[in-house]
A protein has these predicted regions:
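N-terminal leader/targeting and assembly helices and adjacent pre-domain segments
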Residues: 1-205, 296-302
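Acidic, glycine-rich two-metal-ion catalytic cores of nucleic acid-processing enzymes
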Residues: 204-302
Length: 302
């Protein structure tokens, strides 16, 4: 069983890294915001018609830019290149691809952050668990096949990782779609042309700079950190033969009622289910679980 000191160390490690990633996310969205407004401004100044045919060289350049990304954002790349390669691409398809590039770049960076989280947090949990076993070998036992058991239990969460990855790409796609609509209005309406920059800001960073697609990405990162921490902790418990865990609600003024209501409740590890009795219970959840010491003796007595 981890000491309170080791628990705090693990929490700081997981959410400290997450906080650094969130700062980076804010910077990336601000940068994308500037680039996208630059692309829209250039398009509007060119005074080309929204529905007119795109030049072949411009299309080839846009396709080349889109194809520089890795497989994590392949669905996004395929979607935006298809409109340039199939049929007769228009200026609208071209400008959409150009505003998509900065956001797909953000999406790729988000995937990289989550992959790092997905490796770092389980490694930290395993490392601290082994250190605790050295300090208190009777209370925190590590079996000889711990690493094998840990790997088997950890491999069961691959499908959940896919769902988180889909959320990132969906968030990026929705932002691009909304920006395309802003660009179309600006191209076809004089009043909208004056306001497009504010509209792009609202979509990407929110009205006051703390919302929009950036806030959605930050939420995904916090939720994924909580997911990784609790899945890694659960895998550690199963590998060490721990049978029960206690739900620990985030000790903060913004803790939700559902999490607060089950704070301290004890559950069987085999019954653990994310969103029911295992964090994350909801987006932005930062709750955790701790081991419940088995007080049963060799004869089954408490």
């Amino acid at each position: 069983m981890l000491s309170k000191k080791q628990q705090r160390r693990l929490i700081r490690s997981a959410y400290g890294t997450s906080a650094q990633f969130i700062k980076a996310i804010k910077r990336m969205y601000r940068s994308a915001d500037r680039q996208i407004k630059g692309e829209i401004s250039a398009f509007l100044m060119s005074e080309v018609d929204w529905s007119s045919p795109a030049e072949k060289d411009d299309v080839e350049d846009a396709v080349a830019e889109l194809k520089q990304f890795d497989s994590s954002v392949a669905p996004l790349v395929a979607f935006y290149t298809s409109s340039l390669l199939l049929g007769h691409p228009k200026q609208s398809d071209l400008v959409t691809a150009r505003v998509a590039v900065p956001l797909i770049k953000v999406g790729q960076s988000l995937h990289e952050m989550m992959q790092r989280n997905g490796k770092k947090i389980p490694n930290d949990v395993s490392k601290i668990s082994k250190e605790q076993a050295v300090q208190t070998p009777r209370l925190h036992q590590i079996p000889y096949n711990y690493n094998i058991e840990l790997q088997q239990n950890s491999s069961q969460v691959i499908v959940q990782h896919k769902g988180i990855s889909d959320n990132v790409n969906r968030n990026i796609h929705q932002a691009i779609t909304r920006i395309r609509e802003v660009c179309q209005r600006a191209a076809q309406d004089t009043d909208a042309k004056r306001d497009y920059a504010k509209d792009v800001d609202r979509i990407l960073t929110g009205k006051d700079g703390s919302g929009g697609a950036s806030a959605q990405a930050e939420m995904i990162m916090r939720t994924q950190t909580c997911h990784e921490l609790n899945q890694a902790t659960t895998a550690d418990f199963k590998a060490r033969g721990v049978s029960k865990y206690r739900f620990l609600s985030l000790e903060a003024v913004n803790s939700c009622e559902d999490c607060t209501n089950i704070d301290g409740n004890v559950y069987d590890i085999d019954d653990a289910q994310e969103g029911v009795n295992l964090p994350p219970m909801h987006p932005n959840c930062q709750c955790w679980i701790e081991e419940v010491e088995d007080t049963t003796d060799d004869y089954g007595n408490q």
